Amino acid sequence: SIGDLVARYKKMRGFHVLHPMGWDSFGMPAENAAIKHNIPPKKWTLENIANMTRQLKALGLSYDWDREVTTCKEDYYKWTQWFFELFYKRGLAVKKESAVNWCDTCNTVLANEQVIDGKCWRCDHEVVKKDLSQWFFKITDYADELLKDLDLLPGWPERVKTMQHNWIGRSEGLEFSFEIPALNDTVAVYTTRPDTAYGVTFMALAAEHPLIKKICENNPKADEINAFCERVRNQSEIERTSSESEKEGVFTGVYCINPFTGRKVEIWVTNYVLYDYGTGAVMGVPTGDQRDWMFADKYSIEKIVTICPIGKELKLEEMTCAYEEKEGMLVNSGEFTGMEMHKAMSAIMDKAEAEGFGKRRVNYRLRDWLISRQRYWGAPIPIIYCPHCGEVLVPEDQLPVRLPEDVSFTAGAKSPLATSEEFVHCKCPKCGADATRETDTMDTFLCSSWYYLRYTDAHNDKMPFDKDVNNYWGPVDQYIGGIE
């Protein structure tokens, strides 16, 4: 009724008003409800849409029903698939192996934004990590642009822009490498605090770090390390990163060399480092980071004071926690001793670059958008796998790739689409050889991310929307919805 009030008011003021209605109708809730009532998801969804349409029309709301869009209909998701192909051609849709969030109850992966306090946003079930080959959109390629363009939104609430800033999470720091003589290898770390590099007393690896496999070769501690990694991988991200969670780890028996000091540093596998942020390895500086302090306390690892308050000495025996203040002076830091910490940051990065073991780097908390779902009720991903040609896009004139109806919804972790022989088996559009289709579907947010554009040109069967028509109506003046 709020939207209807605004639309009627603007019409009476002489504005051309676009006030449409549509149905974001793919996704797990509809699929689960259909399964529960033993009815096909399409039938269940369209019957509910018809009922809600009847109710809205009975209320007399001033929607332009001629512009109605329904994301689960073929005339809409054809264009969602078309967008996927456009992104693929431009190198922005990629398939890669990744540790993903997995919900055993929903039998599907979840994007980071769909995990709330370590639980599935739909069913509240605990989420675990699982290695799968998945499709991603490379939104990280646009991280700087997304951040910079927040300044072009002067009317947006500050709390929303702050959320976006934190979600993108831009930071500047140093990436540098520690040699591992026993393995003839190196391990790289990323830090925003290069001024603490002289205080490194251990190396903390994420349980998913690929170096662990090499560390475990002919290592008497391999069973202990692998068991620990398996346990940690099943912990939620919230559980692992919470400041209140117990910091745990296993010493690997292997050492690396701090390039700044030449000192041997123990390599540990820990539960508080995440592989998908930075490099998946963190330099442990107990006196400069509270998590490292707690970890060093638990395992009796050496602590070295490298930063003191200006004009004041910090004695290790008198410290009860890490010194994390933003002002200070370096001590026990070689040629940088006595330097103010912010000046030292730049000077230490200069040294790493000059000596060839490190480089300045910009890092982001933002991750690529995981769009694969092992569910039925979503837009099929228009990819064919050929033994000769590899990944092949479904030709544009063959879109949409339609959802099959002869599927099983009790396939466990297997996508329901994989149970349809007729859907899976096809011919390669390039060479004509026997091939198979991608059986994952797209995240429902893919369909709902562009419907506002389709409203402007809802009956166009030649393209998703006409640019000139969209420019006439856009951008959206008022949107009523959640903070996301």
List where the protein language model places each region.
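Structured ligand/cofactor/substrate-binding pocket environments in proteins
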Residues: 1-7, 24, 71-81, 95-96, ...
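Conserved active-site neighborhood of enzyme catalytic/cofactor-binding cores
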Residues: 1-6, 11-18, 119-121, 254, ...
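N-terminal cofactor/phosphate-binding cores enriched in small/glycine residues
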Residues: 1-44, 50-54
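Pocket-edge structural micro-motifs
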Residues: 21, 139, 178-180, 191, ...
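A short small-residue
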Residues: 28-34, 61-64, 473-476
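A general alpha-helix detector
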Residues: 29-33, 145, 211
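Residue patterns forming the tRNA-binding/recognition surfaces of aminoacyl-tRNA synthetases
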Residues: 36-187, 194, 281-400, 409, ...
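A short acidic-Thr-Gly-centered motif at the start of a beta-strand
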Residues: 175-183, 257-259, 275, 431-434
